[in-house]
A protein has these predicted regions:
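Extended ligand-binding clefts on enzyme/binding-domain cores
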Residues: 7-139, 146-264
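Long, compositionally biased
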Residues: 263-271
């Protein structure tokens, strides 16, 4: 949006110079090579530090995506143990936490009702690589470029469908062939989905109101779709395939507005620059309590930022303009 011609030039130059086109070229920490396991499993499951987000759950349920039950476990502990009339027994369903929810400070399943929400499936994610750049991401980037009329070396449809086929996050070795086969067996039918399945999120704790999913686009590629609809399909599937790379997903969300996620809760907890329905556009500068750093922020940082040091200030590339 900032400079479409420059974006086109650089994207076409990148493709002409060579980009990731095979699984062997993917970049990341491959645990079957480096040894050890995926640290996210330790962080999620052992430390009880992280749980599935309702936004990701929403998108997976919209398409009955294989990842829902492949990558995540049903609530492994009781949810809302202190509320006998509103308790979700362990092993009932895959459930995520709404962004912005007040989850409490304790980590015990009795003291914190959110502790029992869905963890990672260690069988699928225990040896999953930590990808820095996946083949699927490159495919979706090229699909978007093709929709914009750039020379990406192929069609948007072909790149889009290949991105979905290459979305698997598990280890690519034969060690987990059965899990990989499970995903591959589901892809052909997945690519024919015409529209999203309606979904209403119900908070198992009862703390927050029900949320109706705003995702309506299907998976199937239709050449008759508008450019905007094609972009929404690409970014929505890219969001699924990119798990657990949340930073890349946040960039796309700010850049395009997709996928259509639930609004964040408790916006008043922010720095006053965010209204209901908005999202965090950036992280404020760190170290603002240090005199030297604060001086640097005031003299150069704010000038480069072009706005106040707030969560709602857009970065230079985050332009409030149509996608096309």
């Amino acid at each position: 949006k900032v400079n479409p011609e420059r974006a086109k030039q650089w994207a076409e130059e990148a493709v002409a110079s060579g980009v990731i086109e095979t699984e062997d070229q993917e970049i990341g920490f491959i645990n079957s090579v480096t040894g050890g396991g995926n640290p996210l499993v330790e962080i999620w499951n052992s430390w009880s530090d992280t749980r599935l987000g309702a936004g990701y759950e929403q998108v997976l349920r919209a398409y009955n995506h294989p990842f829902l039950n492949m990558l995540f476990e049903k609530n492994t502990r009781i949810v809302n143990a202190k509320e006998p009339n509103n308790t979700l027994e362990a092993g009932t369903k895959v459930c995520g936490i709404l962004a912005g929810a007040h989850v409490g400070q304790e980590q015990g399943s009795t003291s914190n009702p959110y502790n029992g929400f869905s963890q990672l499936n260690p069988k699928a994610m225990g040896s999953a690589p930590l990808y820095l750049m996946k083949l699927s991401e490159v495919c979706f980037l090229r699909a978007e470029g093709a929709v914009r009329g750039w020379n990406m070396g192929g069609t948007a449809k072909d790149f889009y469908e290949k991105g979905i086929r290459e979305a698997n996050v598990i280890d690519r070795t034969l060690q987990h062939r059965s899990l990989r086969q499970k995903y591959e067996n589901a892809v052909d039918n997945y690519l024919t989905i015409e529209s999203a399945t309606p979904f209403t999120y119900v908070d198992p704790t009862g703390n927050d109101a029900d949320r109706v999913s705003q995702i309506t686009v299907g998976v199937k590629w239709n050449e008759s779709d508008s450019k905007e609809t094609k972009l929404e399909k690409i970014i929505t599937q890219k969001y699924i395939a990119g798990f657990p790379n949340s930073l890349e997903a946040w960039v796309d969300l700010r850049r395009t507005g997709y996928p259509r996620l639930f609004n964040m809760l408790n916006m008043a907890d922010g720095d006053g620059s965010l209204s209901d329905g908005a999202m965090v556009r950036r992280l404020p500068f760190p170290g603002s309590t240090d005199d030297a750093t604060l001086k640097e922020i005031n003299e150069t940082g704010l000038k480069a930022l072009g706005g106040p040091d707030k969560q709602g200030t857009r970065l230079w590339w985050d332009v409030n303009a149509p996608n096309f």
